[in-house]
Regions:
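A short beta-loop-alpha structural element at the N-terminal edge
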Residues: 8-22, 26
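Conserved GNAT-fold acetyl-CoA-binding loop/helix
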Residues: 31-54
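A short helix-loop-beta-strand connector motif used in the catalytic cores of GNAT acetyltransferases and
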Residues: 47-68, 122-128
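Conserved beta-hairpin
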Residues: 61-79, 135
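Conserved acyl-donor/pantetheine-binding loop and adjacent beta-alpha core of acyl/acetyltransferases
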Residues: 76-133, 139, 189-193
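Conserved GNAT acetyl-CoA-binding A-motif
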Residues: 125-128, 154-167
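Conserved acetyl-CoA-binding loop-helix of GNAT-fold acetyltransferases
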Residues: 140-153, 177
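Conserved active-site alpha-helix within GNAT-family acetyltransferase domains
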Residues: 145, 157-159, 168-185, 191-192
Length: 204
């Protein structure tokens, strides 16, 4: 299904993975969490692009049919639906070979970070916004909000909460405007950056 909604958002398909990965890599190139996971600047952009395409999009987001794009590939939101918002042990094991190829010697560091993030992840059924990224040249146009509204309207209609981790004060401010509230504290290991777990109850 590639039908575009009234907001200009469409459900992404597997063939969109390379373009969406480029958008995410550009959006998160200087993100403090991305820098922590991949500290070597010289090859960070290329490795981010490979990680988004080969791991997060092809193996996680797109198979769940809850990854959305807007204005072609200018913005992307990767959601995981209720009941699938946490990766089980077997899922994580299946991802390890692809992660090892992309992350190389940074794999142990990444696994520690993922473990810290998972430790505060709520168990109650919810929609999980794994990542939301907009091409830097298109930021400030409201594309992120339009991507958010697409699934948050469904959350409200189905009376299901939503959860995410914001990685910057700027993204946290966006999510606060859309009804999310702070839900505890999270800091990545080894004096890593702060993240903001956020929870949103469905609105009437």
């Amino acid at each position: 299904m590639t039908t575009m909604t009234p907001t200009g958002v469409r459900r992404a398909q597997m063939q969109d993975a390379p373009a969406l990965a480029r958008t995410l890599a550009r959006a998160f190139a200087d993100d403090p969490v991305s820098v922590w996971f991949l500290p070597r600047q010289e090859d960070r952009a290329a490795r981010l692009r490979r990680a988004y395409e080969q791991v997060f999009l092809r193996r996680i987001g797109l198979p769940h049919e809850a990854t959305f794009s807007i204005d072609g590939h200018a913005g992307v939101a990767l959601w995981l639906p209720p009941g699938q918002a946490r990766l089980g042990v077997l899922d994580q094991l299946r991802l390890l070979p692809a992660m090892a190829v992309v992350l190389g010697r940074d794999l142990p560091r990444a696994l520690r970070g993922m473990s810290a993030i998972d430790a505060v992840h709520p168990h109650e059924p919810h929609w999980y916004l794994w990542m939301l990224g907009v091409d830097p040249e298109r930021q400030g146009e409201g594309l992120g909000s339009r991507l958010l509204v697409e699934v948050l309207a469904r959350c409200d209609a189905e009376r299901v909460p939503a959860y995410l981790e914001a990685s910057t004060e700027e993204s946290r401010a966006l999510y606060l405007r859309h009804g999310f509230e702070d839900a505890g504290e999270l800091r990545l290991p080894a004096d890593g950056p702060r993240m903001w777990p956020m929870w949103r109850e469905p609105r009437p």
